[in-house]
């Protein structure tokens, strides 16, 4: 019997056992990007964390319907398109493609469904019409607004009191609103802005209704898990609940709500508005993408994460050690001439950590323990052991380490590829040739030439390591 999967449900503020409505087809919806610019590294935390969750759900239930949307109509997109004098699709197509490339570099598996708002205008209009028919929305001056007072449970996710929210609303409330807290479902578009025909005139949808309509279109009126950044909890997720439950006769919109914490940079939340962002696109050009993924998983997903160059360096050094261990184990297995493919099995300790509300720090500590076990075995065999006599142990510990990494989307590269990062194939061959020349020079006792080659490589940022299995090299 599999262990219980327990997740922190922000709706109840408790860690609870999770069982999907349909165990043969769990559903997961994650709020995706608004594609008007490069994603910053804080935007990547959710996709990476919930990528681990999606993989866990697939292992546990054998299937998953996972949707992550693309917001491709928005006032920020409109502003960017107007500034450049191009259609919004020029902006959105470009940055959606870059986003997908950046997420792929971080090892994020694409969702099963990636709905775009502009492809769901009929569903959005239909949901708005249903809300009007149900008495939860009203048309005014070309706008359609959701009536917050019509939904008694408004505020149940964020635990905000509706009266206090209304008291704190802006003083200059739009005159077409019945109440200050009412929010836009549809807004009119001028000729220079993108728009679609609707019963209320030419216009475009509000942000919140887009997610409600897309989630319902692809996953149904009730989904098992809705996830996103904690900054979206209010008003976005609160408004999604109100719209969806009022449109579907009170049916629960999402049974579990998961929110990842924010990234901090020098003590402040990382955000475009504060100007303290680092984009994923820039970071993957400077650092190993796998190290960025490791760093994003190094703290529990619900906690804030202090982002720094030191964190990236620490993650890179840790992966150096782990890949070095895998490389040494593979070399020892080669000595035994086994030729047997390693079967990756996820250790129960790692699976248990992830089943406990995605405890990735604990899972990473288990990986470190397995690597220590592997290095101890390696040292024992190097210093007097016989690899061929203990091939089953070598297989088992390497499979365990690879399986542990697999659960987190780590350690799946060939170690040679990891250590040759930042070089192309021709450069790899050149460096390998120099390493071989140095070994030959040492054998011939031409130590001056050997030292000169080591210095040349060091100047290029190449570190050499003499091991019982031969000379290894890696980028510093």
From Swiss-Prot:
Binds 1 zinc ion per subunit. Gene3D superfamilies: Cysteine-tRNA ligase, C-terminal anti-codon recognition domain, HUPs. One of its GO terms (molecular function) is cysteine-tRNA ligase activity. It is found in: Cytoplasm. A motif ('KMSKS' region) lies at residues 269-273. It catalyses: tRNA(Cys) + L-cysteine + ATP = L-cysteinyl-tRNA(Cys) + AMP + diphosphate. InterPro entries: Cys-tRNA-ligase, Cys-tRNA-synt_Ia_DALR, Cys-tRNA/MSH_ligase, CysS_C, Rossmann-like_a/b/a_fold, tRNA-synt_1_cat_dom, tRNAsynth_Ia_anticodon-bd. One of its GO terms (cellular component) is cytosol. A motif ('HIGH' region) lies at residues 33-43. Zn(2+) binds at residues 31, 211, 236, 240. Pfam families: CysS_C, DALR_2, tRNA-synt_1e. Monomer. This is Cysteine--tRNA ligase. It comes from Xanthomonas oryzae pv. oryzae (strain KACC10331 / KXO85). The gene is cysS.
């Amino acid at each position: 019997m599999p262990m219980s999967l327990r997740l922190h449900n922000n709706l109840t503020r408790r860690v609870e056992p999770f069982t999907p409505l349909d165990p043969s087809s769990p559903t997961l919806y994650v709020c995706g990007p608004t594609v008007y610019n490069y994603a910053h590294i804080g935007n990547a935390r959710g996709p990476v964390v919930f990528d681990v969750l999606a993989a866990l759900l697939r292992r546990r239930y054998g299937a998953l319907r996972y949707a992550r949307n693309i917001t491709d109509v928005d006032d920020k997109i409109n502003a960017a398109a107007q500034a450049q004098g191009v259609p919004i699709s020029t902006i959105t197509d470009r940055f959606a493609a870059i986003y997908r490339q950046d997420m792929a570099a971080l090892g994020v598996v694409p969702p099963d469904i990636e709905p775009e708002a502009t492809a769901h205008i009929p569903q959005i209009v239909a949901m708005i019409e249903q809300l009007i028919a149900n008495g939860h929305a009203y048309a005014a001056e070309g706008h359609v607004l959701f009536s917050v007072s019509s939904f008694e449970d408004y505020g149940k996710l964020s635990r905000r009191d509706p009266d206090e929210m209304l008291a704190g609303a802006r003083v200059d409330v739009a005159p077409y609103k019945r109440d200050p807290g009412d929010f836009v479902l549809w807004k009119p578009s001028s000729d220079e802005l993108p728009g679609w025909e609707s019963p209320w005139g030419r216009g475009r949808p509000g942000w919140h209704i887009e997610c409600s309509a897309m989630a319902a279109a692809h996953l149904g009126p009730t989904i098992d898990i809705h996830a996103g950044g904690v900054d979206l909890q209010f008003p976005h997720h609160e408004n999604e609940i109100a719209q969806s439950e009022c449109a579907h006769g009170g049916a629960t919109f999402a049974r579990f709500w998961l929110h990842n914490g924010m990234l901090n940079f020098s003590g402040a939340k990382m955000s475009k508005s504060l100007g303290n962002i680092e984009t994923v696109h820039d970071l993957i050009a400077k650092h190993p993408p796998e190290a960025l993924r490791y760093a994003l998983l190094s703290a529990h997903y619900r906690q804030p994460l202090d982002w720094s160059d030191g964190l990236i360096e620490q993650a890179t050094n840790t992966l150096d050690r782990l890949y070095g261990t895998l490389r040494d184990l593979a070399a020892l297995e080669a000595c035994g001439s086994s030729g047997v493919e390693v079967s990756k099995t996820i250790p129960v300790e790692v699976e248990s950590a992830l089943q406990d509300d995605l405890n990735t720090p604990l899972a990473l500590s288990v990986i470190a323990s397995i690597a220590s076990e592997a290095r101890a075995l390696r040292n024992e065999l190097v210093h007097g052991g016989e690899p061929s006599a203990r091939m089953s142990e070598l297989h088992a510990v390497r499979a365990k380490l690879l399986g542990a990494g697999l659960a987190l989307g780590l350690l799946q590269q060939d170690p040679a590829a990891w250590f040759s990062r930042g070089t192309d194939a021709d450069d790899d061959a050149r460096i390998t040739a120099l390493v071989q020349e140095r070994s030959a020079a040492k054998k011939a006792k031409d130590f001056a030439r050997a030292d000169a080659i080591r210095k040349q490589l060091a100047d290029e940022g190449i570190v050499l390591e003499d091991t019982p299995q031969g000379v290894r090299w890696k980028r510093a």
